[in-house]
Regions:
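Structured C-terminal cap/extension of enzyme domains
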Residues: 231-435
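Structural motif corresponding to the early beta-alpha repeats
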Residues: 120, 124-138, 162
Length: 435
C-alpha cells in the first residue's frame, strides 16, 4: 500500500487545498466504460429479461464500501471513506460495470452514492436500490421516498422489493393496496423504470413470487456450492425476468479466502474465478453481484471475461474433481439422498435448521471449508428470516424421530448434528447490517 505524505509532518493547508481541487476536478472527468481493459477482456453484457436493459455480467454491490450500517448525516462521513467509495464506483465504470446496486437497509450507502451519482453521465448508469416491504404501505412509501432523496436522481432504473423471504412478506407486497401498488405509483410518475424483488427465501416462496408475474427481475442466491434455487431461475426465464445473483463470492463460500483444498480442486482457476465462470456459463444468469469494498476488489473477477467462451473446455475437469472429492469424502449414497425428507426449521423441534447444518457438514467434510462453515453456522439463531433456524447445540432436549421419519438417514442425522455443532459451534455471528 502506498501512503501519500508518510512521516511525522502534517500536510500544510496548501497541500490540503490542492488535494481537494484534484478530487473535485476528477469528479468531472468523462468515464468510458471498459476503456481501462485491453480488448481481450472487455466487459460483456446480457439482456436483463423483460427490462431489455443491457446488463453487465458483473454488478457493483453497495454493502461493503459505505461508512456505516447505520444512517448518519452526510457531514459525519469521513472524507477518506467517501473518496474510497467514489474511487470504487469510478473503477467499476472504467471496466464497464455500469450497474450500481444498493439498498435503504445498507446504512449510509445510498446517501454516499447520492454525492457522486448526479455528477456522472446518467445515460451510462443502471441504478438499483431496494426497499423492504412493510405491513403498512404508507411506511413503505415514506421509506422509498427517502431512498430516492438520498440518491438525488430524477429516476432509478431498478427498484427491488427487498427481502421477500416469507409468505407473509410476499403478501405485504402483492396484496391489493400493498407495497407493490405504491411502487407502481412511483413507476407511473417516471421515478422508477422497472420493479423486481430480492430474496433469501426457500425456493417454494421464490417460485410463488415469480408466478405472480408482477416482477421484472429477481435477485437470488445460486452458485456452485448451493444450486437449490435453479428451479426459480428456470421459472424466471419463463417469465422473461432478469436474474441477478446475490453474493456469489461471500455467501458462495468466502472465495476471497479459500481453503487450500478448494484451491487445489479448482486449479488452474482460482475458486473465485471458477465460481464466476460456473455461474455465467448458464445464459439464464445475467449478472453477478460483486460487493466491492475498494477499487481493487474487481480485479480477480475480471479474469473470467476472456474465459467465458472457453467455459465448456475449462469447467468439466474442475467439476469432475469437485464431485469426486465429495464422493470420496461423503459416499455416493449420502450425496444422492441426504436432502430427502428433511423438515423445515419451523417443522423441527427447537427450530433446528437441519438442512443447512447438514449442508455445512458436507462442505466442511468434502472441501475443508471450515471458516465459511463456522461463519454460517454461528449466524443461525441471529439471522431472522434472512437466515432462519437454530443451531444444534441443545439437540439432547428434543426428540427428532417424528420430524425425520421420512429421511432415509433418520438414525444417522442426530449424530451428525452433534458432530457438526462440536466442530463449528463458537462465537455468535451477526448479519452485516447488525454489526
Amino acid at each position: 500500500m502506498f501512503c501519500i505524505g508518510r512521516g511525522n509532518h502534517a500536510p500544510t493547508p496548501y497541500i490540503l487545498l490542492f488535494s481537494a481541487f484534484i478530487l473535485l476536478l476528477s469528479s468531472f472527468l468523462p468515464i468510458s466504460p471498459s476503456s481501462a481493459l485491453p480488448p481481450s477482456v472487455l466487459m460483456q453484457y446480457r439482456r436483463f429479461g423483460r427490462t431489455t436493459l443491457s446488463m453487465p455480467v458483473f454488478s457493483c454491490g453497495g454493502m461493503r464500501y459505505q461508512h456505516s450500517w447505520k444512517d448518519s448525516p452526510s457531514w459525519h462521513i469521513p472524507r477518506k471513506n467517501q473518496a474510497n467509495l467514489e474511487a470504487t464506483i469510478r473503477r467499476a465504470l472504467e471496466v464497464g460495470i455500469t450497474h450500481i446496486e444498493t439498498a435503504r437497509g445498507y446504512g449510509t450507502s445510498e446517501i454516499q452514492l447520492g454525492r457522486l451519482l448526479p455528477r456522472l453521465p446518467r445515460e451510462k448508469l443502471i441504478v438499483q436500490t431496494k426497499v423492504s416491504p412493510k405491513p403498512d404501505p404508507q411506511d413503505f412509501r415514506h421509506t422509498l421516498e427517502q431512498s430516492l432523496q438520498n440518491l438525488r436522481l430524477e429516476h432509478i432504473d431498478l427498484l427491488g422489493i427487498h427481502g421477500i423471504n416469507t409468505p407473509e412478506l410476499l403478501d405485504y407486497t402483492v396484496r391489493p393496496g400493498g407495497c407493490l401498488e405504491v411502487a407502481r405509483a412511483f413507476q407511473r410518475a417516471g421515478r422508477i423504470r422497472h420493479i423486481g424483488f430480492s430474496t433469501h427465501a426457500p425456493t417454494w416462496v421464490i417460485l410463488q413470487a415469480i408466478e405472480t408475474d408482477q416482477f421484472d427481475y429477481v435477485n437470488l442466491h445460486w452458485y456452485y456450492i448451493n444450486q437449490d434455487n435453479w428451479p426459480a431461475i428456470e421459472a424466471a426465464q419463463r417469465h422473461d425476468m432478469g436474474v441477478f445473483i446475490i453474493s456469489p463470492s461471500d455467501k458462495g463460500g468466502h472465495l476471497y479466502d479459500p481453503p487450500q483444498t478448494l484451491v487445489d480442486l479448482c486449479a488452474p482457476l482460482s475458486p473465485m474465478v471458477f465460481n464466476d465462470l460456473f455461474c455465467l456459463s448458464h445464459p439464464q444468469v445475467h449478472t453477478l453481484s460483486l460487493g466491492a469494498a475498494r477499487p481493487s476488489d474487481f480485479d480477480e473477477h475480471l479474469q473470467v471475461l476472456p474465459l467465458l467462451e472457453r467455459a465448456q473446455e475449462l469447467l468439466p475437469p474442475i467439476l469432475q474433481r469437485l464431485e469426486q472429492a465429495a464422493l470420496d469424502a461423503l459416499g455416493a449414497d449420502w450425496l444422492s439422498t441426504w436432502k430427502l425428507g428433511l423438515p423445515a426449521p419451523e417443522d423441527t423441534p427447537g427450530q433446528i435448521n437441519i438442512p443447512v447444518i447438514l449442508w455445512l457438514y458436507n462442505l466442511l467434510t468434502a472441501f475443508d471449508m471450515a471458516d465459511y462453515a463456522k461463519a454460517r453456522y454461528n449466524l443461525l439463531g441471529q439471522g431472522g428470516h434472512w437466515f432462519p433456524g437454530q443451531q444444534a447445540g441443545d439437540i439432547d432436549r428434543w426428540d427428532l424421530s417424528k420430524c425425520l421419519a421420512r429421511s432415509p438417514h433418520a438414525q444417522k442425522i442426530p449424530k451428525l448434528l452433534v458432530e457438526t455443532h462440536r466442530r463449528l459451534g463458537g462465537e455468535t455471528v451477526r448479519r452485516l447490517s447488525q454489526s
